Design a protein with these regions (language model features):
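Hydrophobic core of transmembrane alpha-helices in multi-pass small-molecule transporters
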Residues: 53, 65-83, 276-292
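Juxtamembrane intracellular "pre-TM" segments in multi-pass secondary transporters
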Residues: 155-191, 207
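Helix-to-loop junctions at the C-terminal end of transmembrane segments
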Residues: 26-39, 129, 230-247, 336
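C-terminal ends and interior cores of transmembrane alpha-helices
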Residues: 48-63, 256-273
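Central cavity-lining transmembrane alpha-helices of secondary-active solute carriers
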Residues: 14-32, 221-234
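Short amphipathic helix-loop junctions that connect adjacent transmembrane helices
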Residues: 1-10, 199-216
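Conserved MFS/SLC helix-loop-helix module at the cytosolic interface between two early adjacent transmembrane helices
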Residues: 24-61
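Cytoplasmic helix-loop-helix junction between adjacent transmembrane helices
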Residues: 72-114
Protein backbone atom coordinates (compact mmCIF):
# COMPACT_ATOMS: atom_id res chain seq x y z
CA UNK A 1 0.00 0.00 0.00
CA UNK A 2 2.75 2.47 0.97
CA UNK A 3 4.66 1.54 -2.20
CA UNK A 4 1.61 2.55 -4.26
CA UNK A 5 1.55 5.86 -2.39
CA UNK A 6 5.02 6.57 -3.76
CA UNK A 7 7.21 5.44 -0.86
CA UNK A 8 10.51 3.86 -1.90
CA UNK A 9 11.40 0.42 -0.43
CA UNK A 10 13.97 2.07 1.86
CA UNK A 11 11.40 4.63 3.06
CA UNK A 12 8.96 1.80 3.82
CA UNK A 13 11.68 0.02 5.79
CA UNK A 14 12.27 3.19 7.81
CA UNK A 15 8.64 3.09 9.01
CA UNK A 16 9.49 -0.09 10.92
CA UNK A 17 12.68 1.24 12.51
CA UNK A 18 10.97 2.65 15.59
CA UNK A 19 9.23 -0.67 16.24
CA UNK A 20 12.32 -2.85 15.76
CA UNK A 21 14.68 -0.49 17.62
CA UNK A 22 12.48 -0.55 20.69
CA UNK A 23 12.42 -4.35 20.42
CA UNK A 24 16.20 -4.37 20.90
CA UNK A 25 16.04 -2.09 23.96
CA UNK A 26 12.99 -3.80 25.49
CA UNK A 27 14.44 -7.31 25.41
CA UNK A 28 17.75 -6.16 26.87
CA UNK A 29 16.18 -4.18 29.73
CA UNK A 30 13.14 -6.47 30.07
CA UNK A 31 15.26 -9.52 30.88
CA UNK A 32 16.88 -7.64 33.75
CA UNK A 33 13.51 -6.38 35.02
CA UNK A 34 12.06 -9.89 34.89
CA UNK A 35 14.90 -11.26 37.02
CA UNK A 36 14.74 -8.33 39.45
CA UNK A 37 10.97 -7.83 39.81
CA UNK A 38 9.54 -11.18 38.70
CA UNK A 39 8.09 -12.33 35.39
CA UNK A 40 4.53 -11.74 36.57
CA UNK A 41 5.24 -8.01 36.73
CA UNK A 42 6.90 -7.80 33.30
CA UNK A 43 4.00 -9.81 31.86
CA UNK A 44 1.44 -7.47 33.42
CA UNK A 45 3.36 -4.35 32.36
CA UNK A 46 3.33 -5.71 28.81
CA UNK A 47 -0.43 -6.32 28.89
CA UNK A 48 -1.08 -2.83 30.29
CA UNK A 49 1.10 -1.19 27.63
CA UNK A 50 -0.70 -3.11 24.86
CA UNK A 51 -4.05 -1.84 26.16
CA UNK A 52 -2.67 1.72 26.15
CA UNK A 53 -1.34 1.33 22.59
CA UNK A 54 -4.70 0.08 21.30
CA UNK A 55 -6.55 2.84 23.13
CA UNK A 56 -4.30 5.42 21.46
CA UNK A 57 -5.58 4.24 18.07
CA UNK A 58 -9.24 4.67 19.07
CA UNK A 59 -9.00 8.47 18.72
CA UNK A 60 -10.82 10.38 15.93
CA UNK A 61 -9.37 9.88 12.44
CA UNK A 62 -7.97 13.42 12.16
CA UNK A 63 -5.76 12.71 15.19
CA UNK A 64 -4.19 9.60 13.63
CA UNK A 65 -1.06 11.33 12.39
CA UNK A 66 2.02 9.36 11.30
CA UNK A 67 3.89 10.35 14.48
CA UNK A 68 0.96 9.32 16.70
CA UNK A 69 0.62 5.93 14.98
CA UNK A 70 4.39 5.33 15.14
CA UNK A 71 4.32 6.11 18.88
CA UNK A 72 1.44 3.67 19.40
CA UNK A 73 3.33 1.11 17.33
CA UNK A 74 6.46 1.58 19.46
CA UNK A 75 4.47 1.06 22.69
CA UNK A 76 2.81 -2.00 21.16
CA UNK A 77 6.23 -3.38 20.19
CA UNK A 78 7.55 -2.89 23.73
CA UNK A 79 4.47 -4.66 25.11
CA UNK A 80 4.79 -7.57 22.69
CA UNK A 81 8.46 -8.17 23.52
CA UNK A 82 7.86 -7.97 27.28
CA UNK A 83 5.12 -10.59 27.02
CA UNK A 84 7.13 -12.88 24.73
CA UNK A 85 10.24 -12.73 26.90
CA UNK A 86 8.20 -13.29 30.08
CA UNK A 87 6.25 -16.25 28.69
CA UNK A 88 9.29 -18.10 27.32
CA UNK A 89 11.34 -17.47 30.46
CA UNK A 90 8.46 -18.66 32.66
CA UNK A 91 8.43 -22.10 31.01
CA UNK A 92 11.96 -22.73 32.32
CA UNK A 93 10.68 -22.19 35.88
CA UNK A 94 7.53 -24.30 35.41
CA UNK A 95 9.05 -27.42 33.80
CA UNK A 96 10.88 -29.70 36.29
CA UNK A 97 14.67 -29.42 36.07
CA UNK A 98 16.28 -32.02 33.82
CA UNK A 99 13.19 -32.78 31.74
CA UNK A 100 14.61 -31.43 28.48
CA UNK A 101 12.09 -33.26 26.30
CA UNK A 102 9.16 -31.66 28.12
CA UNK A 103 10.87 -28.26 27.98
CA UNK A 104 11.34 -28.56 24.20
CA UNK A 105 7.71 -29.62 23.72
CA UNK A 106 6.26 -26.68 25.66
CA UNK A 107 8.61 -24.15 24.07
CA UNK A 108 7.58 -25.43 20.62
CA UNK A 109 3.88 -25.23 21.51
CA UNK A 110 4.23 -21.68 22.85
CA UNK A 111 6.33 -20.49 19.90
CA UNK A 112 4.15 -22.13 17.26
CA UNK A 113 0.80 -21.11 18.72
CA UNK A 114 2.00 -17.50 18.99
CA UNK A 115 2.82 -17.34 15.30
CA UNK A 116 -0.27 -19.26 14.18
CA UNK A 117 -2.41 -16.79 16.15
CA UNK A 118 -0.44 -13.93 14.61
CA UNK A 119 -1.38 -15.17 11.14
CA UNK A 120 -5.01 -15.72 12.18
CA UNK A 121 -4.95 -12.16 13.52
CA UNK A 122 -4.69 -10.84 9.95
CA UNK A 123 -8.05 -12.41 9.12
CA UNK A 124 -9.63 -11.58 12.49
CA UNK A 125 -8.47 -7.97 12.15
CA UNK A 126 -10.05 -7.74 8.71
CA UNK A 127 -13.32 -9.17 10.06
CA UNK A 128 -13.42 -6.76 13.02
CA UNK A 129 -12.58 -3.86 10.74
CA UNK A 130 -15.48 -4.63 8.40
CA UNK A 131 -17.87 -5.36 11.30
CA UNK A 132 -17.02 -2.68 13.88
CA UNK A 133 -14.93 -0.14 11.96
CA UNK A 134 -11.37 0.83 12.92
CA UNK A 135 -12.12 2.46 16.30
CA UNK A 136 -14.59 -0.26 17.26
CA UNK A 137 -12.08 -2.97 16.36
CA UNK A 138 -9.24 -1.58 18.49
CA UNK A 139 -11.63 -0.92 21.41
CA UNK A 140 -12.87 -4.52 21.21
CA UNK A 141 -9.29 -5.84 21.26
CA UNK A 142 -8.40 -3.57 24.18
CA UNK A 143 -11.45 -4.87 26.06
CA UNK A 144 -10.41 -8.51 25.61
CA UNK A 145 -6.87 -7.69 26.75
CA UNK A 146 -8.24 -5.88 29.80
CA UNK A 147 -10.03 -9.08 30.85
CA UNK A 148 -6.78 -11.05 30.35
CA UNK A 149 -4.89 -8.40 32.35
CA UNK A 150 -7.29 -8.76 35.30
CA UNK A 151 -6.98 -12.57 35.23
CA UNK A 152 -3.20 -12.25 35.10
CA UNK A 153 -3.19 -9.95 38.14
CA UNK A 154 -5.29 -12.48 40.05
CA UNK A 155 -3.60 -15.74 39.13
CA UNK A 156 0.08 -15.26 38.19
CA UNK A 157 2.46 -16.12 41.04
CA UNK A 158 4.26 -13.10 42.47
CA UNK A 159 7.73 -14.69 42.62
CA UNK A 160 7.63 -16.28 39.16
CA UNK A 161 11.13 -16.09 37.62
CA UNK A 162 12.45 -13.69 40.26
CA UNK A 163 16.18 -14.16 40.88
CA UNK A 164 17.13 -15.33 44.37
CA UNK A 165 20.38 -13.36 44.29
CA UNK A 166 20.71 -9.61 43.77
CA UNK A 167 20.66 -8.76 40.06
CA UNK A 168 23.02 -6.01 38.89
CA UNK A 169 22.23 -3.96 35.80
CA UNK A 170 25.63 -4.91 34.35
CA UNK A 171 24.36 -8.52 34.13
CA UNK A 172 22.14 -7.67 31.13
CA UNK A 173 25.03 -8.77 28.90
CA UNK A 174 25.50 -12.54 28.92
CA UNK A 175 28.78 -14.04 30.12
CA UNK A 176 27.93 -17.52 28.83
CA UNK A 177 29.77 -18.51 25.60
CA UNK A 178 26.89 -20.83 24.63
CA UNK A 179 24.31 -18.06 25.01
CA UNK A 180 26.50 -15.56 23.12
CA UNK A 181 27.09 -17.93 20.17
CA UNK A 182 23.42 -18.89 20.01
CA UNK A 183 22.41 -15.21 20.17
CA UNK A 184 24.69 -14.35 17.23
CA UNK A 185 23.22 -17.27 15.28
CA UNK A 186 19.69 -16.06 16.07
CA UNK A 187 20.52 -12.56 14.84
CA UNK A 188 21.65 -13.84 11.44
CA UNK A 189 18.81 -16.39 11.29
CA UNK A 190 16.13 -13.71 11.53
CA UNK A 191 18.13 -11.36 9.33
CA UNK A 192 18.08 -14.14 6.71
CA UNK A 193 14.29 -14.26 6.84
CA UNK A 194 13.48 -10.57 6.99
CA UNK A 195 15.98 -9.41 4.34
CA UNK A 196 13.65 -10.79 1.66
CA UNK A 197 10.38 -11.38 3.48
CA UNK A 198 9.51 -8.04 5.13
CA UNK A 199 9.81 -5.41 2.37
CA UNK A 200 11.15 -7.03 -0.80
CA UNK A 201 8.72 -9.95 -1.12
CA UNK A 202 5.39 -8.07 -0.71
CA UNK A 203 6.52 -5.35 -3.16
CA UNK A 204 7.84 -7.95 -5.62
CA UNK A 205 4.59 -9.95 -5.52
CA UNK A 206 2.56 -6.82 -6.23
CA UNK A 207 4.91 -5.08 -8.65
CA UNK A 208 6.21 -8.00 -10.74
CA UNK A 209 3.45 -10.61 -10.43
CA UNK A 210 0.59 -8.12 -10.29
CA UNK A 211 -0.98 -9.52 -7.11
CA UNK A 212 -3.39 -7.14 -5.35
CA UNK A 213 -3.36 -6.34 -1.60
CA UNK A 214 -5.87 -9.09 -0.78
CA UNK A 215 -3.80 -11.80 -2.48
CA UNK A 216 -0.49 -10.64 -1.00
CA UNK A 217 -1.90 -10.20 2.52
CA UNK A 218 -3.83 -13.48 2.43
CA UNK A 219 -0.86 -15.44 1.10
CA UNK A 220 1.52 -14.10 3.75
CA UNK A 221 -1.06 -14.58 6.53
CA UNK A 222 -1.57 -18.23 5.56
CA UNK A 223 2.22 -18.61 5.39
CA UNK A 224 2.54 -17.36 8.98
CA UNK A 225 -0.23 -19.72 10.18
CA UNK A 226 1.48 -22.68 8.49
CA UNK A 227 4.83 -21.54 9.87
CA UNK A 228 3.39 -21.55 13.39
CA UNK A 229 1.89 -25.03 12.97
CA UNK A 230 5.25 -26.42 11.81
CA UNK A 231 6.94 -24.83 14.84
CA UNK A 232 4.68 -26.82 17.18
CA UNK A 233 5.69 -30.01 15.33
CA UNK A 234 9.43 -29.26 15.48
CA UNK A 235 10.15 -31.67 18.40
CA UNK A 236 8.79 -34.59 16.33
CA UNK A 237 10.70 -33.49 13.23
CA UNK A 238 14.02 -33.19 15.08
CA UNK A 239 13.85 -36.60 16.77
CA UNK A 240 12.16 -36.11 20.15
CA UNK A 241 9.79 -38.99 19.31
CA UNK A 242 12.85 -41.30 19.25
CA UNK A 243 13.92 -40.02 22.65
CA UNK A 244 16.59 -37.67 21.28
CA UNK A 245 16.82 -34.05 22.41
CA UNK A 246 18.59 -31.85 19.82
CA UNK A 247 21.72 -29.84 20.61
CA UNK A 248 23.84 -27.15 18.95
CA UNK A 249 25.03 -29.55 16.24
CA UNK A 250 21.43 -30.14 15.18
CA UNK A 251 20.90 -26.37 14.96
CA UNK A 252 23.94 -26.07 12.67
CA UNK A 253 22.58 -28.79 10.39
CA UNK A 254 19.15 -27.18 10.07
CA UNK A 255 20.73 -23.78 9.37
CA UNK A 256 22.82 -25.37 6.61
CA UNK A 257 19.67 -26.88 5.09
CA UNK A 258 18.02 -23.44 5.17
CA UNK A 259 20.99 -21.90 3.34
CA UNK A 260 20.85 -24.64 0.69
CA UNK A 261 17.12 -24.15 0.03
CA UNK A 262 17.47 -20.35 -0.14
CA UNK A 263 20.39 -20.67 -2.58
CA UNK A 264 18.30 -22.97 -4.78
CA UNK A 265 15.42 -20.45 -4.81
CA UNK A 266 17.89 -17.65 -5.67
CA UNK A 267 19.39 -19.65 -8.55
CA UNK A 268 15.98 -20.51 -10.05
CA UNK A 269 14.81 -16.89 -9.84
CA UNK A 270 18.15 -15.63 -11.22
CA UNK A 271 17.70 -17.76 -14.34
CA UNK A 272 13.99 -16.85 -14.54
CA UNK A 273 12.81 -20.47 -14.26
CA UNK A 274 9.08 -20.21 -13.48
CA UNK A 275 9.71 -17.45 -10.89
CA UNK A 276 6.10 -17.26 -9.69
CA UNK A 277 5.90 -20.99 -8.94
CA UNK A 278 9.46 -21.00 -7.60
CA UNK A 279 8.77 -18.22 -5.11
CA UNK A 280 5.37 -19.58 -4.01
CA UNK A 281 6.62 -23.14 -3.45
CA UNK A 282 10.06 -22.02 -2.33
CA UNK A 283 8.58 -19.78 0.33
CA UNK A 284 6.57 -22.73 1.69
CA UNK A 285 9.66 -24.94 1.91
CA UNK A 286 11.75 -22.07 3.31
CA UNK A 287 9.04 -21.38 5.90
CA UNK A 288 8.87 -24.99 7.06
CA UNK A 289 12.65 -25.28 7.48
CA UNK A 290 12.89 -21.84 9.06
CA UNK A 291 10.11 -22.79 11.51
CA UNK A 292 12.09 -25.81 12.69
CA UNK A 293 15.22 -23.64 13.03
CA UNK A 294 13.33 -21.02 15.04
CA UNK A 295 11.66 -23.54 17.35
CA UNK A 296 14.94 -25.40 17.90
CA UNK A 297 16.75 -22.15 18.74
CA UNK A 298 13.96 -21.10 21.13
CA UNK A 299 14.35 -24.38 23.00
CA UNK A 300 18.15 -24.18 23.13
CA UNK A 301 18.23 -20.69 24.66
CA UNK A 302 15.82 -21.66 27.44
CA UNK A 303 17.83 -24.84 27.97
CA UNK A 304 21.16 -22.95 28.07
CA UNK A 305 19.84 -20.15 30.32
CA UNK A 306 20.80 -20.36 33.97
CA UNK A 307 18.04 -21.37 36.41
CA UNK A 308 18.30 -18.32 38.68
CA UNK A 309 17.24 -15.21 36.80
CA UNK A 310 16.47 -17.08 33.57
CA UNK A 311 15.06 -13.94 31.92
CA UNK A 312 18.53 -12.30 31.86
CA UNK A 313 19.83 -14.81 29.30
CA UNK A 314 16.50 -15.07 27.46
CA UNK A 315 16.20 -11.27 27.26
CA UNK A 316 19.75 -10.93 25.89
CA UNK A 317 19.00 -13.61 23.30
CA UNK A 318 15.79 -11.95 22.12
CA UNK A 319 17.64 -8.64 21.97
CA UNK A 320 19.82 -10.32 19.32
CA UNK A 321 16.63 -11.60 17.67
CA UNK A 322 15.27 -8.04 17.46
CA UNK A 323 18.64 -6.82 16.16
CA UNK A 324 18.42 -9.40 13.38
CA UNK A 325 14.91 -8.22 12.47
CA UNK A 326 16.09 -4.61 12.45
CA UNK A 327 19.09 -5.44 10.27
CA UNK A 328 16.99 -7.59 7.93
CA UNK A 329 14.26 -4.96 7.56
CA UNK A 330 16.72 -2.19 6.72
CA UNK A 331 18.61 -4.35 4.24
CA UNK A 332 15.37 -5.60 2.70
CA UNK A 333 14.46 -2.04 1.73
CA UNK A 334 17.93 -0.89 0.70
CA UNK A 335 19.07 -4.01 -1.21
CA UNK A 336 15.74 -4.35 -3.03
CA UNK A 337 15.81 -0.68 -4.02
CA UNK A 338 19.42 -0.71 -5.24
CA UNK A 339 20.02 -4.30 -6.43
CA UNK A 340 16.65 -6.04 -6.78
CA UNK A 341 14.88 -9.07 -5.35
CA UNK A 342 17.45 -11.72 -6.31
CA UNK A 343 20.15 -9.81 -4.41
CA UNK A 344 17.95 -9.97 -1.29
CA UNK A 345 17.84 -13.76 -1.67
CA UNK A 346 21.64 -13.99 -1.92
CA UNK A 347 22.06 -11.83 1.20
CA UNK A 348 19.66 -14.27 2.89
CA UNK A 349 21.89 -17.16 1.80
CA UNK A 350 24.95 -15.42 3.29
CA UNK A 351 23.15 -14.80 6.59
CA UNK A 352 21.97 -18.44 6.71
CA UNK A 353 25.56 -19.60 6.27
CA UNK A 354 26.66 -17.28 9.09
CA UNK A 355 23.92 -18.81 11.27
CA UNK A 356 25.73 -22.15 11.09
Amino acid sequence: YFHQLGYSPLEIASLFLFYEFFGVITNLIGGWLGAKLGLNRTMNIGLALQIIALSMLAVPTDMLTVIWVMLAQAISGIAKDLNKMSAKSAIKTLVPSGEQGALYKWIAILTGSKNALKGAGFFLGGFLLSWLGFSGAVIAMAGVLLAVFILSLCYLKGDLGKAKQKVKFSQIFSKSPSVNILSAARMFLFGARDVWFVIALPIYLGQVFGWDHLWVGGFLALWIIGYGIVQTLAPKVTGKAQGKTPDGRAAMGWAGLLATVTALIALLVTFNLSPQITIALGLMIFGAIFAVNSSLHSYLIVSYAKEDGVSLDVGFYYMANAMGRLMGTLLSGWVYQTQGFVACLWVSVAFSVLTT
